[in-house]
């Protein structure tokens, strides 16, 4: 993508015209606003002509303004000039209202549409996109960038139409009055065009940097707010203050650079315009000819009205460049292919037989193979525990089953059907996940249990799921029970309580295949007991793949797969693996999990 202006760069024009396509649903309102701005622009030359009649009327106020118009042939300048001024003001007010109000409706609708489309698009993007982009920049696109884009698509159009038509009407009137003098004004237009093009390149480049800097500010603020407990626990206040100060200062510096560019550019443009005006006034005085005083005053007045709209037209380049830079990042996200879903198979229900054959996987953009020739099978209702050091590939394997990522080689079969052949939504309806990083939403306890496809579940089913997850004991003590707000990400609940709500959510889903990533965080004895009982309940009768950290869970597994560096190095029951006195036995002696060696992610 080049940094040239929309006037010069085909790529920028393409972006801008694509952006204008979002105005199409509001074309009726948009046309009304254009009519309003045309009305407004038409009043500018009228003011010049009124001054002509006013000056001429000073010497003969009884002169008739419209001698050839019926009903008006007797109206003298004395009555006509004041009346016309009032009528022109009313006409201008009507145009201003139509233009500004209806364009505001278009602008607000455009903001809404773009934000909704961006948010909806976020929900369809593949996991790898979130791996490469931090949340601050994604949020900044929805908030800051959309505002910049709307300015380019609507506010800039307002200036271009209103001020552009004003310039055209004024130039037309000036040419009609004295075309020779008007050519002097037209002679400076090429110089103005060169200045606008040069400034546009700078504005576009600086706008991109500002949007990145604004994303950095949002990112730091978002991270600090989400992790405020860690910040306070580890005395990170000073570090975060410095980090935010640096991000905010970087944004301020870039904003100032853009302001400085405009502050230099606008006075230079004014100097060029007023220099042309000075030459024009000299020629008016020198070449007056047989023109009346009123005609000369009208001509100079209309010429004097030109610098303001010309300056605003030149300054709109800044708004357009900000919008084009913002639109570029927005369209970059909108153009990302959504999650791959080429499957056609839909099953109303499955038994839960899971088989993995010769599975290998490498994360996109990396070379290290995370999974290497993995094979195992789980019969319906059985449990397989994945055990291994951190970074051995356990979580990656679990993420491939619901197709958060797509495997390179091998097969993952669910009831004999490759998971890639399922329709994505249908596949995930058969899978429930409980991860160690519990996500709760700023809503009620009940709505967090009955989330997504589960919304609308009968109240008794929600209560049963909560009871089976051993969560009703603490829910009953909450101020409003199941209708209590849990705060952002369940901040008002303890770690054990949040985990039990996640288990209740999985129980309510009642999926035949459960993927469980046990929490490694230390909990009090009572919470540990409740969670273990809840896990026993949720795993009962379901095919379960568990990333196990608790010895009690591992001992209950029908099959234990011991993983190291992406491979299954041992398999068997707890007793069998201990008897082998191998890798599992060593992990067991060290507490079942040891740190990953250097270089293992």
Swiss-Prot record:
UniProt free text on domains: In MsbA the ATP-binding domain (NBD) and the transmembrane domain (TMD) are fused.
Enzyme Commission number(s): 7.5.2.6
UniProt entry keywords in alphabetical sequence: ATP-binding, Cell inner membrane, Cell membrane, Lipid transport, Membrane, Nucleotide-binding, Translocase, Transmembrane, Transmembrane helix, Transport
Entries under NCBIfam families matching the protein: MsbA_lipidA
Subcellular location: Cell inner membrane
ABC transporter domain location: 354-590
Protein topology in the membrane: Multi-pass membrane protein
Protein name: ATP-dependent lipid A-core flippase
Record-annotated ABC transmembrane type-1 domain positions: 31-322
Keyword Calcium: no
Free-text function comment from the UniProt entry: Involved in lipopolysaccharide (LPS) biosynthesis. Translocates lipid A-core from the inner to the outer leaflet of the inner membrane. Transmembrane domains (TMD) form a pore in the inner membrane and the ATP-binding domain (NBD) is responsible for energy generation.
Subunit comment: Homodimer.
A molecular function (GO) term: ATPase-coupled lipid transmembrane transporter activity
GO cellular component terms attached to this protein's record: plasma membrane
Entries under Gene3D superfamilies matching the protein: ABC transporter type 1, transmembrane domain, P-loop containing nucleotide triphosphate hydrolases
Residues spanning the membrane: 27-47, 83-103, 174-194, 267-287
Record-stated family: Belongs to the ABC transporter superfamily. Lipid exporter (TC 3.A.1.106) family.
Catalytic activity annotation: ATP + H2O + lipid A-core oligosaccharideSide 1 = ADP + phosphate + lipid A-core oligosaccharideSide 2
Primary subcellular site in the record, as a coarse category: membrane
Entry annotated with the keyword Cell inner membrane: yes
Binding-site residues for ATP, renumbered to this chain: 388-395
């Amino acid at each position: 993508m080049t940094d040239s202006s929309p006037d010069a760069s085909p790529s920028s024009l393409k972006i801008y015209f694509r952006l204008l396509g979002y105005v199409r649903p509001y074309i009726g309102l948009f046309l009304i606003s254009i009519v309003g701005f045309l009305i407004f622009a038409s009043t500018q030359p009228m003011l010049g002509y009124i001054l002509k009649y006013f000056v001429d009327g000073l010497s003969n106020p009884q002169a008739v303004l419209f001698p050839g118009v019926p009903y008006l042939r007797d109206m003298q300048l004395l009555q006509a000039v004041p009346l016309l001024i009032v009528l022109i003001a009313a006409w201008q007010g009507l145009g201003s209202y139509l233009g500004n109000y209806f364009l505001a409706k278009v602008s607000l609708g455009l903001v809404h549409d773009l934000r909704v489309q961006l948010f909806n698009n976020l929900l369809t993007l593949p996991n790898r996109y979130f791996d490469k982009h931090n949340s601050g920049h994604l949020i900044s696109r929805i908030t800051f960038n959309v505002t910049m884009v709307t300015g380019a698509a609507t506010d800039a159009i307002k200036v271009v139409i209103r001020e552009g038509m004003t310039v055209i009407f004024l130039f037309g009137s000036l040419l009609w009055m004295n075309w020779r003098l008007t050519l002097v004004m037209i002679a400076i237009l090429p110089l103005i065009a060169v200045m606008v093009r040069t400034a546009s390149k700078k504005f576009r480049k600086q706008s991109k940097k500002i949007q990145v800097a604004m994303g950095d500010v949002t990112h730091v603020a978002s991270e600090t707010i989400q992790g405020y407990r860690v910040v306070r626990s580890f005395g990170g206040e000073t570090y975060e203050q410095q980090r935010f100060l640096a991000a905010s200062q970087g944004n301020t510096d870039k904003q100032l650079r853009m302001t400085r560019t405009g502050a230099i550019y606008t006075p230079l443009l004014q100097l060029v315009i007023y220099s042309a005006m000075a030459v024009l006034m000299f020629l008016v005085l020198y070449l007056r000819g047989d023109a009346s005083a009123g005609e000369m005053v009208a001509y100079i007045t209309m010429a004097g009205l030109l610098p303001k709209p010309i300056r605003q037209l030149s300054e709109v380049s800044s708004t357009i460049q900000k919008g084009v830079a913002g639109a570029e990042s927005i369209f970059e996200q909108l153009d990302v292919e959504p999650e791959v879903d080429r499957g056609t198979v839909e099953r109303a229900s499955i038994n839960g037989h899971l088989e993995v054959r010769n599975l290998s996987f490498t994360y996109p953009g990396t070379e290290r193979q995370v999974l290497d020739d993995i094979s195992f099978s789980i019969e319906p209702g059985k449990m397989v525990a994945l055990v291994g050091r951190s970074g051995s590939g356990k979580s990656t394997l679990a993420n491939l089953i619901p197709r958060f990522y797509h495997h390179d080689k091998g097969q993952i079969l669910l009831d004999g059907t490759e998971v890639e052949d399922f329709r994505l939504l249908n596949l995930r309806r058969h899978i429930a996940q409980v991860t160690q990083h519990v996500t709760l939403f700023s809503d009620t306890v009940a709505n967090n249990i009955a989330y997504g496809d589960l919304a609308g579940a009968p109240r008794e089913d929600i209560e049963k799921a909560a009871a089976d997850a051993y969560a009703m004991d603490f829910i009953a003590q909450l101020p409003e029970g199941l209708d209590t707000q849990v705060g952002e990400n369940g901040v008002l609940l303890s770690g054990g309580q949040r985990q039990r709500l996640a288990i209740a959510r999985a129980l309510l889903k009642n999926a035949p295949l459960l993927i469980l990533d046990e929490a490694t965080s230390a909990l009090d004895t009572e919470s540990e007991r409740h969670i273990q009982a809840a896990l026993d309940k949720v795993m009962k009768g379901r095919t379960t793949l568990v990333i196990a950290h608790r010895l009690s869970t591992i001992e209950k597994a029908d099959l234990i797969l011991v993983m190291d560096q992406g491979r299954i190095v041992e398999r068997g029951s707890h007793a069998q693996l201990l008897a082998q006195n191998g890798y599992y036995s060593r992990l067991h002696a060290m507490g079942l999990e040891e740190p990953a060696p250097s270089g293992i992610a």
